[in-house]
Amino acid sequence: MSVLGFDIGNLNCYIGVARQGGIEVITNDYSLHATPACVSFGPKDRSMGVAARQAVTTNIKNTVINFKHLIGRKFSDPVAQRFIPFIPCKVVKLPNDDIGVQVSYLGEPHTFTPEQVLAALLTKLRTIVESQLSDVKKVSDCVLAVPSYFTDVQRRAVLSAIQYAGLNSLRIVNETTAIALAYGIYKQDLPEEDAKSRNVVFLDIGHSSTQASLVAFNRGKLQMVNTSYDLESGGIWFDALIREHFRKEFKTKYGIDAATSPRPWLRLLDECERVKKQMSANQTPIPLNIECFMEDKDVTGKMQRQEFEDLAAPIFNRIKQVLINLFADGVSIKPEEIDEIEIVGGSSRIPMIREIVKDLFGKEPKTTMNQDEAVARGAAMQCAILSPTFRVREFAIKDTQPYRIRLSWNSTGENGGENDVFSPRDEVPFSKLVSLLRSGPFNVEAHYAQPNVVPHNQVHIGSWKVNGARPGADGGNQKVKVKVRVNPDGIFTIASATMYEPRIVEEVPAEAMEVDGDAKTEAPAEPLEPVKKTKLVPVDLEVIESIPVSYDVQKFHNLELQMQESDAREKAKADAKNSLEEYVYEMRDKVSDQYAEFITPAAADEFRSVLTSTEDWLYDEGEDAERDVYEKRLSELKAVGTPVVERYRESETRKPAFDSFDQSIMRVRKAYEDYANGGPTYAHLDSKEMEKVINAIEDKKKWLDEARHKQETRSKTDAPVVFTEEILQNKNVFENVVNPILNKKKPAAPAPPKKEEPQPAAGDQPQSQPGEMDVD
């Protein structure tokens, strides 16, 4: 069973794997821990991860990046509109205000949803795991981390994408919770359960957003006290700020506007990210140089850290506000009660972040956790906790949900009502019962009660129709209990609805207990009459769910499978073409060099001609041939080349094999001569067995001499008459005969006879020792 945690960031993804020795973040096919969150669509296949990101400038119109905040959102959503300009391909509005990315795939226009793009990325991550871990045959179960501020509809969208990719989600864990788990589960010095908690603030400044969490730790448990976030502070916002600065500078200096062309605009963003990172490590001005940027113009600029900090002051203020918001009304812990502050996330390396933390808490922030991998490690640990194949020390997690959820209801001919069933910072997973009086079917709706604090324009969570309620015997209402729940994935649902109907039931009273003595004198008791009682009997009601966005999981899973099959076919074809190309280059060089002695000049000329024509074909008609065509041509070339390679390799290994066999025979012959001359080493051996030894010597020596002579008379361009493998087999047969005989141990020498002690003469009696006394 795979135990995996996926951290899907806006820029990069990380894969955490639980092993017996702990959590490991594995590398991808480019030996990097970070896999870019990038999917590129081409005329023949898809590419994801590093390969897609490296080719983004050459396939910019068909590449999807920075799409994390489009998942589960509508096209008109203000957050989606803020991130769409960072996506180089065309983003379109679909029916129902859904989002689509429009690309050219397999030579035809296609429109994919952000959830489909996420599924493609998850497919790539699964492929990485299966190729990098030999003990994992097929990846199925996983835990995926999402921002703590993701709403109900976004979480459902992520679950759908996981299903599109053919994976099974054990849990969706909040990124803030994953970080806290990665921190706390290994700590040996946490306070005891009944002692004052260790209060830790985690500040995660990622690529597209900033999250903070306040967590109370005790031995064996963590409690999420509060979380806060900001969607306009993070790495991409710093990069965009620097980019805008240079855009204006280049417009004035060179008369070009990078924002008018997608390719230079994206290229400038990448360069600004590099400048930002270098400014974090250097006080000196950092240069920015781009050749042939636009209109064949080279551009140069520079920026110093102080200038960047002045430009980014509004973003730094937003990050500070995120930390302040942790201590909102209702939070009992004060800033002065914070024991530690841990900073993670790629943008936490900016020096000003440390100053903000120090200014607010009066303490230096810590960086004891891996700033890039903390979320993936925590997600993998959560997966290990849920997995039956792992034994993990007990660690209780009390998580919270961030929004106020309100339930409203109605029924035909009756006034409805509403009630807040979950408040911000309520523990999850958790269930509550709402009691209603109903006489017929009714509808229940859930929505976020404070739209201004929810970062999503879809505040309606869902509707549920409850069927089966009916009037009581008196025609009045009956009690109905509706069970509402926020499940471990952070998704709200109505788990059940139960009507409690009064019914008359008969109960036989319990008989009085007999007491010894009385039973003999009293007459037999008459049977007791049943007593009629009214009881509330639970009746399960039908609940029909209707959520704002529905996903056709089977349809999109089948589409993903088709694309995976297409990718696999194209990869197999590319591998076959590469194998043919590599063979042509290798053999063309070696036939004129190290293989030259092992092929006749005429055959070599003909072979080189075929190799050259194959190379020409590869770059002409064979540029896009089928896999079996490449394999057939390679097979035809190997029919000529393999015997040449075989002759070369045999010439390299045959002589050492002959020499080794010769030495083995000489060693055994020397042992036999020692035996024949009466030497002590083999004197204990049986003559019949030693006859087997000398026969084996003569037989194999004869074979060896004949084989060597036959081979020496052959030309190097002829096929070998004896192969190295045959020599080694004969050597093994020989040694299996002689070694057991020669290695027999000498029998143990007989023990020396015991020396007999003289017996006393008859009549001699031993003298009694003084002090001894005979007693009758």
From Swiss-Prot:
Any one Pfam family match given in the protein's UniProt record, by short name: HSP70
KO phenotype (gene knockout): RNAi-mediated knockdown in a sod-1 mutant background results in increased aggregation of denatured proteins in neurons.
MF-aspect GO terms: adenyl-nucleotide exchange factor activity; ATP binding; ATP-dependent protein folding chaperone
One Gene Ontology CC term in the entry: nucleus
Keyword Nucleotide-binding: yes
The organism's place on the tree of life at top rank: Eukaryota
Family: Belongs to the heat shock protein 70 family.
PANTHER family: HSC70CB, ISOFORM G, HSC70CB, ISOFORM G-RELATED
Protein name: Heat shock protein 110
UniProt organism field: Caenorhabditis elegans
